[in-house]
Amino acid sequence: MILPEELASKSVIPAIRALVVKRLVEEHGMTQQQAAKLLGVTQPAVSKYLHQKRGAAIRLNGIKEVDQATGEIANMVSSRKVKPLEVMSRIEAACTYIKRNRYMCDLHKRLEPGIDIESCHICEQ
């Protein structure tokens, strides 16, 4: 049995980080090392995010609200003026949006074929 929180921590949060890393490097002109330092991860982790070796289990790009959130998070991080708790809060809000709007359901079904995602409404609560 895979809990939604497990799925979020192992798939959604890395996917959000991957999108933020991509923005920091491509839009804000940061090096992998700079992005890693600001996000509190290693440079090899940033490389894996950029090469879709980490954070690729669930596709979140193209979802308007997620794109907006990752843009805001990248701006917050790159400004270096925002407290880490504010960044954490924004990431958590993005995770909540993803769960409540059922963007994790297909991945959950792939990982746990016995789950009936049509009758499941756990994440909407």
Where are the model-predicted features located?
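Short, Lys/Arg-enriched anionic-surface-contact patches
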Residues: 1-17
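Short, amphipathic alpha-helical "recognition" segments used to contact nucleic acids or chromatin
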Residues: 13-29
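Short alpha-helical "recognition helix" segments of helix-turn-helix
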Residues: 31-37
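Short coil turns linking two alpha-helices in DNA-binding domains
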Residues: 40-42
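C-terminal flanking helix
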Residues: 53-54
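Short Lys/Arg-enriched helix C-cap and helix-to-coil transition segments
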Residues: 57-73
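Helix-turn-helix/homeodomain-like alpha-helical modules used for DNA recognition
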Residues: 72-125
